[in-house]
UniProtKB/Swiss-Prot annotation:
EC number assigned by the record: 1.7.1.7
GO molecular-function term, one example from the UniProt record: GMP reductase activity
InterPro entries to which the protein is assigned, alphabetical: Aldolase_TIM, GMP_reductase, GuaC_type_2, IMP_DH/GMP_Rdtase_CS, IMP_DH_GMPRt
Active site: 174 (thioimidate intermediate)
Residue positions binding NADP(+): 203-226
GO biological processes: purine nucleotide metabolic process
Protein's organism: Pediococcus pentosaceus (strain ATCC 25745 / CCUG 21536 / LMG 10740 / 183-1w)
A GO CC annotation given for this chain: GMP reductase complex
General function of this protein: Catalyzes the irreversible NADPH-dependent deamination of GMP to IMP. It functions in the conversion of nucleobase, nucleoside and nucleotide derivatives of G to A nucleotides, and in maintaining the intracellular balance of A and G nucleotides.
Protein name as catalogued: GMP reductase
Key words, A-Z: NADP, Oxidoreductase
Gene that produces this protein: guaC
Reactions catalysed according to its record: IMP + NH4(+) + NADP(+) = GMP + NADPH + 2 H(+)
Similarity comment: family membership: Belongs to the IMPDH/GMPR family. GuaC type 2 subfamily.
Amino acid sequence: MKVFDYEDIQLIPAKCIVRSRTECDPTVVLGEHRFKLPVVPANMQTIINEEIAEKLAEDGYFYIMHRFEPERRMDFVKKMKDKGLISSISVGVKDDEYALIDQLAEENLTPDYITIDVAHGHAQSVIDMIHYIKEKLPAAFVIAGNVGTQEGVRELENAGADATKVGIGPGKVCITKIKTGFGTGGWQLSALRWCAKVARKPLIADGGIRTHGDIAKSIRFGATMVMIGSLFAGHIESPGETKVEDGVKYKEYFGSASQYQKGEAKNVEGKKIWIHQRGHLRDTLQAMREDLQSSISYAGGRDLEAIRKVDYVIVKNSIFNGDVL
């Protein structure tokens, strides 16, 4: 199988049919809701917190709350429901997580979205959790992952997952490929394309996004939604520590399998980096919206479906020619 990644692909323009890119509609439907953009900030502790989740929901964006403060999830779901906002949480597969599902069911609290968040999602433990959630909270939209193969997509969909997350270790602060020799790092876009050939339900591309153009490429190769970490890290509102060096502010960004997340140096598959503090999150979201509208106009359409139909070329690591933003 020939493989490629984001930097190897250039999408080919089609005849433009709009007078202005502002006519282009970058919204997307996932489950029973329509969202302003086909992007979701990674459910990582230095990317999202309750305040950011609430603001995203208020403004019409999709979010997935992380699972690293497990005792707060019940209250979070209650709060979001009381405010009339979508509730979207993450769970793992350990015994305590089953107890959370039981508690939600007992209190008649069904989150709109539940993401089963496991590094190697093609696992019996994930399938068992899908079955359990669907039994106890049948109305919840279940996202399961992460996987990197057609077999993984098939099994999770057959178990009842409503969407599958694709990507094993391509993220900027993930070192799975280095530590284990496994993953989709370096061929994430090909893995997405491969998985999309068998998927009957939405796919969420997770990891490896370095530019806004990569969002359009993900849509072209089968993603309904694109999960992004590094581009959403380092904002003024971002959780995590801030440091100042030579008058420049930096924000920390670490992987969910890093020792900074785990609190111990055991089974580490993530690292920490410091990112130049950016502006506000709303400005990044607006820039993504404008760039995606431009992508749609280059695709010759008015909405995201146009991007799925464009041709492409493989140019092997040469398209940027050293250019940077």
